[in-house]
Amino acid sequence: AGGVDTVSLENNHVLDMGDSGLEETKETLLAAGIPYASEGEPAILTVKGVKIGSLAYQTFGGRHDELIAKVPGDIQALRDQGCDIVIVSYHWGAEKDYYPNDNQVRLGRATVDAGADLVVGHHSHRINPIEYYNGKYICYSLGNFSFAGNNKPSDMTTFLFQIRMRLRDGEATSEAFKIIPCRISSRTDYNDFAPTPYTDDSSIEVVLRTLR
């Protein structure tokens, strides 16, 4: 069974309904028992005794160097609060790009070097490759999922990223991951906001080839 356990609120649409819309979103999430992460507001979730911290940022305005300097302190602050696993989410890159730019790679790798256990990116509306760097994974873009309007998007491919981590002597190690290639809609003629796993080999291969 799937579900939503934590939400990132860092993206370029978060203020589409103004400050009041953002505050209502936060209140709704908290009322549902779902912690959210935004810059300056980390989320902490405990699962089976494991404390997971989430950080979220957006890079618009060329903030890569600023964040390379800032994020290590934020990661350490979560460690100081007892977090066993730290996940960092970035809203970054350019729309419709299938590959990360040099600044994304620099920031993603610096984030792992600073102690993040997983880096997850989004914004391009396209899936991007996954990098295995210093024992950790950087998902440069998850693509769309339940998004993109009612018309048929030009690219409907997406995927689920499942990772299994194990704590060894207080350190999280990435043991295995699984990719579930999907289409953002159960239909092919328009978007019905019902993400559906692919079953045909050719579509699955398209997703996997893009992620390599």
Q: Language model features by range: what are they?
A:
Residues 1-212:
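Acidic, metal/ion-coordinating pockets
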